[in-house]
Curated annotation (Swiss-Prot):
InterPro entries: ATPase_NBD, Gcp-like_dom, KAE1/TsaD, TsaD. This is tRNA N6-adenosine threonylcarbamoyltransferase. Substrate binds at residues 138-142, 171, 184, 278. It comes from Clostridium acetobutylicum (strain ATCC 824 / DSM 792 / JCM 1419 / IAM 19013 / LMG 5710 / NBRC 13948 / NRRL B-527 / VKM B-1787 / 2291 / W). Required for the formation of a threonylcarbamoyl group on adenosine at position 37 (t(6)A37) in tRNAs that read codons beginning with adenine. Is involved in the transfer of the threonylcarbamoyl moiety of threonylcarbamoyl-AMP (TC-AMP) to the N6 group of A37, together with TsaE and TsaB. TsaD likely plays a direct catalytic role in this reaction.
Amino acid sequence: MCKDIKILAIESSCDETAAAVVVNGRKVLSNIISSQIDIHKKFGGVVPEIASRKHIENISLVVQDAIKEAGVELKDIDAVGVTYGPGLVGALLVGLQYAKGLAYSINKPLIGVNHIEGHISANFIQYPDLKPPFACLVVSGGHTFIVYMKDYGEFEVLGQTRDDAAGEAFDKIARAIGLGYPGGPKIQEMAKRGDESALQFPRAKFHDNSLDFSFSGVKSAVLNYLNTMKMQEKEINRADVAASFQKNVVDFLVDNTIKACKIKKIDRIAVAGGVASNSFLRETMVSRGRENGIDVLFPAPILCTDNAAMIGSAAYFEFKKGNIAPLDLNAIPNLKLGER
């Protein structure tokens, strides 16, 4: 029988300080998250300098809590996994430096993990029997990709945003209609009271049969609509704006993902990233998948937002391939999927 591999994972790419202990890439023994949402809310978004300082304050206790909750000791850990990009450089460095010091002190391998790959790997935790190949829609505040996962750690990008990420567009429109931060959950709640067909906003069209996305156009259209209504001193139905905007974005995401599956002849989609917790996206993707004979997989909401369990899962598969990082590994804020 093969020995179980326990990974201690650390995530600090944005405003969550997180640590987890994961066994064999699929079983979570602990998953501790210290969120900074309440701190950044008053600024309308994440302030990088503040995020870095809070990571410094929190990381040691978060890692200790993860080890304690897992019921293990440091000597039981086989490797230390850590996000080294993409993300906010200062925030990344806090987690990376801590992980390097810890790996050195306990004489265990260091595994560098791509944050986007981590999001995809959250599905291996939710679905322990899941194996590549499959398609994955990664949709979050900073990233929007359609990816074909050929094998563990092997990806082909089929489509990506050419400007704003979907989650970024959610945040900007939420701010514009006075809903505050974080925008995604607030748009979702407001949209439940609105009419999704009340307003027709444009959607980007590419002439090269591309699977790429663009959300700057719909964002600008919503902002122009709001400005026009204000200039004309007309009442704005925020719920209708939220519902119509959300439908526009979700339909774009779903249409391109289904199209990608048909092109690649794939019958299984995994969805990942913070926006994957959006209930309207979940319902629409599952419904469209069923219509097209495609199985649709979503992680639990706690695994959609930034967490270290997903990093532990991705780190396990890197560990199995022998991809050990040097102790001079540096943060790469613009790290691309598939890069090492």
